[in-house]
Amino acid sequence: MPHITDRPIKSISKELEFLKQDLDSKIPPKKLDRNILIATWNIRAFGNLTRKWISRGEDSPKRDLHSILCIAEILSRFDVIAIQEVKSNIRALRDTMKVLGNHWGLILTDVTRGSAGNGERMAYLFDTRRVQLSGLACELVVPKEKLTKIGVDALQEQFVRTPYAVGFRSKNQTFILVTLHIKYGKKAKERKPELKAIAHWLSDWAKNISEYNQNLIALGD
């Protein structure tokens, strides 16, 4: 059985070279003291994988080592990435971290239980040569008194998948990323309550000068 750290087969190596060239043309390079590249990616059902270079029709899941190499190559172009739909099984995530290398860090939530939560986590991957954790990590919860207020498109319960806020530091700058995975629902209007709630939450945070930091960026889908 092949492992993610093994040399890939020739066809995959060739494809990875094409991918690198394409990424070079589309994503700006990392520059010391000049930029910080932040991304968000919903990697659908990012959990288990088949430990073959290329999965076949009978294999489950279809995600294979070839896929992980491609995912890791894309992730490596950024400094911090918020990832949604990380599952309870983190085999694919572990292999991705092996490809990225020892200078990459990871912080993630526990699994959201219940049918609506879909057994998902949220995670941040970050290049420790470029950014470090600032010390803040929290899940955002709406105060009970706000839940009891009835209004148009108001949130009447907690988030199905709790938004995850983590602070990062680069040189003398600190910023807080908030990743969320909004309840999709059957209609667009079903998404409004959670979107409005997170907007109000971040607005209140940014206005309070005594809070940990006011540089806030919301990510996700």
Predicted regions and their residues:
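Divalent cation-coordinating acidic motifs and surrounding scaffolds
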Residues: 1-219
